A protein has these predicted regions:
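An interfacial alpha-helical scaffold signature
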Residues: 1-172
Length: 172
C-alpha cells in the first residue's frame, strides 16, 4: 500500500477568528483583542504531525490508530531558536504550507487551544508557544500570553455562540 497523507477535518473553517484577527490588526483596542482571544480559545486548528506507527485505513475509509501511537507535532523556530507549534486555521492554509521531510509523511491533526495549553504549559515542554498561520498571518501566542489568558479565563467566562457559555476548545 502506498503511503498517503491524512488531512483530518478538511471542512474546518475559522472565518470568524480570521475576521477578529484582521479587525484587531486594523484597529487595535482592548475590545478587538478580547474578541480575537475569545474566538481563538474556542477555535479548532490543524497542526502538522508525524504519527508512529502510521495509521491503518478501514474498509469504510476511517483511520485506525494503534494503541500507543506517538504523535510528533511539527514546529517552527524563530531567530532565537525558540520552537512554536503550528496552528493552521483551515485545510487550504495547511495544504499550501506542507512540511514534509524525506521518507516521512506529515499528517494534519485537529487541535484546540486547550491542547496547546496541555502541551506548551507543561513544565518540561520544549515549546515557547504556538503560531497561527505562520506563513501568512503569523500570529505568535507565547507561553506567557497563554498564562495571562488562562488567568483571565478563570476570573470570568466570556459568552460565545449567542450568549451560550462554552469551554475553550468546544468549537466555533
Amino acid at each position: 500500500m502506498a503511503k498517503r497523507r491524512i488531512l483530518l477535518d478538511q471542512d474546518l473553517n475559522n472565518f470568524d477568528l480570521i475576521v477578529a484577527l484582521k479587525t484587531m490588526q486594523g484597529r487595535p483596542s482592548p475590545q478587538s483583542q478580547g474578541d480575537f482571544i475569545n474566538h481563538m480559545i474556542h477555535s479548532r486548528f490543524l497542526t502538522p504531525a508525524v504519527l508512529d506507527p502510521e495509521p491503518e485505513q478501514s474498509e469504510k475509509g476511517e483511520l485506525i490508530l494503534s494503541p500507543g501511537t506517538k504523535i510528533l507535532f511539527r514546529a517552527v523556530s524563530n531567530a532565537e531558536k525558540k520552537a512554536f507549534l503550528i496552528a493552521f486555521t483551515d485545510a487550504k492554509e495547511a495544504e499550501k504550507n506542507r512540511m514534509e521531510k524525506e521518507g516521512e509523511i506529515t499528517h494534519t491533526v485537529v487541535t484546540t487551544y486547550l491542547d496547546f495549553c496541555n502541551i506548551i504549559l507543561n513544565e518540561h515542554s520544549p515549546y515557547s508557544g504556538f503560531v497561527i498561520n505562520p506563513f501568512s498571518e503569523n500570529v505568535i501566542v507565547t507561553r506567557e500570553i497563554m498564562q495571562d489568558i488562562n488567568r483571565n479565563i478563570k476570573v470570568r467566562q466570556v459568552p460565545l455562540n449567542n450568549g451560550k457559555k462554552t469551554a475553550p476548545g468546544d468549537g466555533n
